[in-house]
Regions:
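Bacterial N-terminal signal peptides
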Residues: 8-20
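N-terminal secretory signal peptides that target proteins for export/translocation
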Residues: 1-4
Length: 272
């Protein structure tokens, strides 16, 4: 019931958000999608605007699926998704053109979190009561069933089985609908533990500590070296026939200045 209600409310909110946005206009680049990329888009948008004179407007609150729907509807010029496109989305003429990587992390409001092993993180999802070393409770924050981050949680930490499904049956666990809700809830709740995207947490200057996994601290350097494995891939997507602003934006991101801006936004190139 809670999962269905969360999904329904997300759908209603998305409809209201899309209805408030005009169709993409010339001279302005309309971008949006996963909340994990909102601050990143604002960051890379500044040098793009300085170089081209094209203003960048980041539409909040869409999520990956909502951003791709808005792109197909002509509301956005470029969307950033936290997952690969579905067959139906590709059939609507959407094309992934650039991928970037950033560490996929667990964050907490705890002042001095320990390094955790992968099994220890998985245990937080299965055990009813887990405590930090000082005895204070670990408060796990979940994401909605359809959220793209769930794939990373399962891939890198939980493995096979419906561990997330069983965790959702625990009424005491809070659910954060958006990436910004997730980070905000993690800041507010004492002893929180939440999955998140490294670039978002750093760029939004969140008052959170990142969990070292098997003794390895997440960073762009440890991701690049292969020492830190959990990875979040972000997909820049535009229509089969992109707007002039979208084409210039993608061209910028592929330039030396754009690659530098993406690196400053705590991401690495992906595989195109």
């Amino acid at each position: 019931m809670r999962a269905r209600l969360t999904s329904l409310l997300s759908g209603i909110a998305l409809g209201l958000v899309l209805s408030a946005f005009p169709v993409a206009a010339a001279g302005v680049l309309q971008v949006g999608g996963t909340g994990a990329a909102a601050a990143l888009l604002a960051h890379v948008g500044k040098p793009f605007t300085q170089q081209t004179g094209i203003a960048v407007e980041v539409k909040p609150g869409l999520g990956s699926s909502g951003g791709l729907s808005a792109l197909a509807a002509g509301v956005l010029d470029v969307a950033v998704a936290g997952r690969a496109l579905s067959g139906a989305e590709a059939a609507r003429g959407l094309v992934p053109v650039i991928t970037i990587r950033t560490p996929f992390v667990f964050v907490t409001s705890h002042h001095a979190p320990p390094s955790m092993t992968v099994p220890e993180i998985a245990n937080v999802y299965t055990a009813e009561k887990v405590a930090w070393p000082d005895g204070s409770p670990v408060v796990l924050i979940l994401r909605p069933r359809e959220d793209a981050d769930n794939h990373c949680i399962v891939q890198y930490f939980l493995g096979k089985g419906d561990v997330l499904g069983r965790a959702r049956q625990r009424a005491e666990l809070p659910v954060a609908v958006t990436d910004q809700d997730n980070a905000g809830m993690a800041e507010r709740l004492k002893g929180s533990l939440a999955a998140a995207t490294y670039a978002q947490i750093i760029l939004e200057q969140r008052d959170l500590r990142m969990i070292a996994v098997d003794g390895v601290v997440p960073s762009i350097e440890t991701l690049a070296s292969g020492a830190y494995l959990p990875t979040k891939v972000l997909y820049f997507v535009h229509p089969l026939q992109p707007s002039a602003a979208a084409s210039r934006f993608i061209q910028f991101l592929r330039s030396d200045e754009g690659v530098r801006a993406l690196r400053e936004a705590h991401t690495l190139p992906g595989v195109e």
